[in-house]
Structure formats: C-alpha cells, structure tokens
Amino acid sequence: FKEDDLLEGTAQPLEDILPQVLAELAPYQEKYGRDIPVFVAGGGLTGEDMARFRGMGAAGVQIATRLIATEECDASQGYKDAILRARGEDVRIIHSPVGMPGRAIYSPLIARMEAGQRQAPQWCAGCIKTCDPAQTPYCITHALIRAVEGDWEEGLFFCGAEVGQVNEMSTVAQVLAEYQAALAQR
C-alpha cells in the first residue's frame, strides 16, 4: 500500500484485492499447469478472518500480531504487554527509516519522532542500503531490538491494524485450534 492510502484510510481492503490477484494469476496457472498459492497478509486476526479469506481462494493467511501475545513467542513480556494494552486508537502509520510505511503502537519513540526530534544512530550495521545514518531520524534496527526486549521508551512496536482486539495471552495451540474450528465450520 502507498503511505497516503494508509494515512487517509483509502487502501483497498484485502477482500477486494484477493479476487484481483487470483484473476491475474489464473492465466499463468493454466499456461504452466501449476497452482500458484496466494497468501494474504494483514487483517487475519480471528478464525472467522482465516475462514473468510480461505473461502475466497487464499491458500493461507499470514498471522503475526496475534502470535506475539502467546506463551511461545520469544519476544519479551514487555512487547507482549504493549500488544495487550494497545487500543485501536494507539495505532499509528509511521514512515520508517527504510522508506516504507508501517503500523506501530504509539510509544514515546513515536512521540519524539512526531515532535521532530532526531535520535542519531550510535552505530550503523549497514543493514539497509536506503538508510542514510547521517539523516535517518532513528535507527530502525536499534528500535526493533529495543521493542523485542520490551523497552517501552526506545522501542518501535510494530503491530497489525486490529491490535486492539488482542487482549489476552494465549498459546499457539489455542490460536490454531480457533482457526481450525472456524475452517471446519465453513
């Protein structure tokens, strides 16, 4: 999605995009006699979401935010707590130092960036070619590591749009059981 579409709320929903992608792939599947699996990403939070997208022809659904709040996730409890505390209005579209938009939980780091404060990187790993350490407002590598470690002040806590619906810890088995039950009912 383009950043402006995300900020203005005009990005096409996956329910509109998926049929278009499947239609574009159909001639190639026929020509080469091979199935080309399509996975949707973004918006697959519940079992009902999973069943809906699978029913529309998706081979699968990438899930992320929901799995952060599981016992098995290796992120710190601080990151998990940030996910569990977040409400819908806490989600911001940020312009990352790598030049792409992303959804993140509003945190002190984002507040500082919105106020125009720059946190010059203390070191550079050279991880992204498009990042200029002399100009970047903050080091995304540092901010992501701080988030995984649970540092609320310095972390960049990426999340999905529906993070406000994730309000309790669970296990991966519980999440997958919910998805399987929803798929079995369709």
What do these predicted ranges mean?
Residues F1-F39, L45-R186:
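Conserved active-site-proximal phosphate/metal-binding subdomains
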